[in-house]
Amino acid sequence: MPRTLLTTLVLLLTSLTARAADGPKVVCFGDSITKAGYPKVLGEILKADVVNAGAGGHTTAMGLKRMQKDVLDAKPTVVVVFFGTNDCRLAEPEVAVPVAQYEKNLTTIADACAKAGAKVVICTMPPINPEPYFKRHKKEPFDKVGGLEKVCEEYRAAARRVAEANKLPLVDLGAQLAKTPEWMAPDGVHPTPAGTKLIAQHIAEAVKPLIGK
């Protein structure tokens, strides 16, 4: 066998062996609910390399600005996209992302991940408990458009549309976590330790088929 061909085959086999050893990588892309720690539990469930790319207070618009560095540069096998709780903060117009733009941003994120060769899982935003939430945020902007739950459901519907239009797995945490209110911390937004585990379990079911588990 010619030396150059042999060298090429050795390099190819070495590359394939390294990739197999590395195994699948999952990047969890989101806000403070992601940052709170479900990716660590997800990694334990999947026995896979799971990266926590959550950032407190972030919207889809903010996420797009850090996506290359925090997500794509990691060369993920799967990206779990989980935004919405901050996008719908109508009481802070400097933060809020209108629902139509939220839908476009989710589509842009999904398209960029697919272009990079990663599979995508879309999550809907979880429930919000209005009593503690409105101790921190003004209620009037929500009341003007039909109330907090109506607003939240509009953002969840947008996430569902993105998943459906792009034939992506959907984890409907808005519906799933509503059945287990113990997931929620007293602030009405973030997960308890038990909630972190529940979120990881729900997401794991969508990710497993994508990484051959």
What is each residue range found by the language model?
Residues T7-T8, T34, T59-T60, T124:
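Ser/Thr-centric signal marking residues that sit
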Residues C28-F29, N52, I122, A185:
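A structural signal for the hydrophobic beta-strands that form the central parallel beta-sheet
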Residues P24-P39, G56-T59, C88:
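Catalytic nucleophile-elbow at a beta strand-turn-alpha helix junction centered on a G-D-S/GDSL motif
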Residues T4-T14:
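Sec-dependent N-terminal signal peptides
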Residues A48-M62:
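A short beta-strand-loop structural module common to alpha/beta enzyme folds
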Residues D22, V41-I45, M62-K213:
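Alpha-helical cap/lid subdomain in secreted, periplasmic
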Residues L16-A20:
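Sec/Tat signal peptide C-region and signal peptidase I cleavage site
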